[in-house]
Amino acid sequence: MRLDIIKNDKMTIINDAYNASPDSMEAALKILGRYKNRKVAILGDMFEMGEHTEYGHRLVGKSAVDNTDVIIAIGKDSKFICEEAKDLGFNENNIHHFNTKEEAIEKIDELVKKDDVVLVKASRGMELEKIVEYLNK
C-alpha cells in the first residue's frame, strides 16, 4: 500500500493508502501529475497533525490543484483540501468531499472514468484500501 501501481482494464491506480503527511501527499501528487491521462486524487485525512491540521491539509489542496484534474476528499479534515482548491480557483465541478469512504464509494463510478489515473492516499486509519479494492474489482 505504498505507491503500489495497479493497472487493470479500466484504469491505473496508485495505491498509497498506508500513511500520509503533507510531504508524502505532495510527493505522491507530483508523481500523479506526471501522467498524461486524466488524473484523479482520492485523498483522505492526515492524522496526528494537532494544531497544524488545517494548514497541512491546505498545503495538500494546493499541491492537488497543481497536479490533478479531479479532487475527491474523504474525512472531516480533508474539507480543508477542498476549501484550498476552491480558493485557488480550481473548477468546483471537479472538487468532491465526502465524510466517509462509504459515501465516496456510492458516487465513485460517476466520478472516475475509463483510462483515468487514480491516486489513493490517506493516513492508515482512514482505511482507503477499501476504495482501492472497489476500484480494482
Each language-model region and where it sits:
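ATP-dependent carboxylate-amine ligase
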Residues: 1-137
